[in-house]
Each structure stands twice: as C-alpha cells, then as structure tokens.
Amino acid sequence: GYAKSVGVNVLDYKYFTNKDSVKVDMFPVILKPVKLGSSIGVSIVKNQEELSYALDVAFEFDDAIIIEPFISGVKEYNLAGTKVNGEFIFSIIEEPQKAEFLDFDKKYLDFSRTSKAKEVDLGDKLNLEIKESFKNLYNTLFEGSIIRCDFFVIDNKVYLNEINSIPGSMANYLFSDFQELFTKVASNLPTKKDIPINFEYVNKIQVAKGK
C-alpha cells in the first residue's frame, strides 16, 4: 500500500474484492470499503455471525474492502497540516475523546462539538515520529491541499489509521487560526493539474443510502 511505500507503519490488513471468498480467522475486526471514508460502510465485526451482514453493507458502496484487527481502547491521535512554499504548517496533535466508534452521522451531523481541541503532548520522540510520518504521507501526493492524518500509538510505535481529505481534513478546531491558514494555502496553490472527475462512488453511496 501507499503508506508502506513511503515508510509509514500500518496495521496488518487483508484485501478482498466482491468476487473473493472472505475468510476471517480472528475477531473482532474492522471492515472498510477501500475507496470511501467518513465511516461510510464501515463495521466493527465481533463474530462470524456478524460478518455476512457487514460484507453486504460494505459491498453496497465499493467493490473492494480491507479488513483490519479492531483494537478496543487503542490510543488515537489526529494531526492536520499542509505545506506552503516548501514549509510544513501543522495543527496541534489531538487525542479525540470519543465513543468506541463514530459513524457518518456522529462525525458530520452532530453539532454538539463547539470548543477547540485540546493539545496532547506525547513527548519529543512520538511527536516527531507522528510529524515525520505525516510529511512522508503528504509529499508529492497531496501537494496544495490540507489533510488530516489519524494515527494509532501501540507500544510506543506510530501506525497510520487513515488519511482524511475533504471533508475530514477540514478540522478547523485543530488550528488556532484556520481562516488564515486557508488563505495561505489558497494563495500559494501549485500549478494546476488536470484531475479526472468520476462520480461512480457518489452514485453508489446515493443508491445504497436509498435502500
């Protein structure tokens, strides 16, 4: 995968398409559509009986999935950032206070969160490792954008959980002055590149949500 190719740790995972026979040897696991985000189609599967339904849900949104071990109580840390004129600008590192799992509605339709995030200090070594992992993930692929990376720390080792582009990257509560940051990025965008636009997955989401 991309993260491993740039030297960033990830949890062991298995990749399946909708044509594969999916086998899980140990539970619990977390099951995710490959090309989506925002917890759409994601399930925590605690036993074999729950697996078939979770697969049906995920394959409504995508034709490929990944399955990872689900580690209850693992520490997760969020870092957002961008690069302007060759220099990285980082948010604070936040440890989100949350329930076991946040679905799409809780992430984007729950407006109860109004305060700024509280910064967490993990010590120089882990703070640096998280930022270096972010840089490795950002360089070349995300030039000119703001992204948020969510990391796990397990036994003092940093692992990537996921990379969030829009809308998850717009974590304005992580920055002291998000408007100023946004203006800097908008004023220093790289040379325009032609990006193919494909609404295939938007259409899949609409169809699946309507069922």
Question: Language-model features: where?
Answer:
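Active-site nucleotide/adenylate-binding loops and adjacent lid/helix of ATP-dependent enzymes
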Residues: 1-73, 131
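Helix N-cap/coil-helix junction residues
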Residues: 8, 143-144, 178-180
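A generic alpha-helix structural signal
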Residues: 52-59, 105, 130-138, 182-186
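Internal helical hairpin/lid segments
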Residues: 112-121, 127-147
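C-terminal hydrophobic structural anchor segments
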Residues: 138-165
